[in-house]
Amino acid sequence: MFLTYVGESGITGATATDPSQPHQVYTGLFVHESQSISMNGEFNALCRRHFGAPLGEEGAPSEIRPVDVYQGLGYFASWPRLKRNELIQDCLGIMVRRETPVITSYINKQEFAAAKAAGDSPFVMMWDSPTGPVINKFFFALSMFLDELNMSTLSGDQIMDGGMPIANHALVVAQTGASMKSEFMPEFLRSDEGIDATGLIDDICFVDPEHSVVNQLSNLCAYFVRRWLQNPERDHPYFDGLRDNKVIQVIYPVTI
């Protein structure tokens, strides 16, 4: 079984047309249950090295928020850029060394708002906010990834027979207080796109990001994907490193 840790970015803007956050991004970091303990241990060792203590203890932040560590805000306001870069690289290195796969979905919130105002798109009119369609696309990307993973384990005879035993399935681990809600998954499974995903996605559970280091890593991925989407012509070494090292594997846009 895979634990799929959900990260998100671009949901704190003032409005759906906030120019500073034109995209809303969700990432799913796939961690096989056999790797979960080692990733947590490596992250805790990283925190001791950078902060002198695990997250949440005296002298350390409660969690690593991407915008804070990247821009030098909050706990990291006194940290020079080089020191912050080293922390980011060490965090991303946990995923790069394992080639931990990440699937991504995103929506252009400004395009959604314009289509909603025009009222001529039946697809857009189904949703009250951009969160619904982009999470629906996220679950679709998740099911497609698992489907391809299961197909890769089949022999030629099994494929010809038309049978596909489900060897790989996922438990979705989302963040308490974030935009992912429990009702989104059954809505997807009842849709035309999700009807074949029932056996692939076990359930969805919610954890406080302060208590889930892998959700924090997934948030970092979502943040750097969003920065790349906003200015794709600029250099984005963190995003490029994740993509070139087979961490960020698929990116699904919501087409409006």
Where are these regions (language model features)?
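Phosphate-ester processing/binding pockets and catalytic centers
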Residues: M1-I256
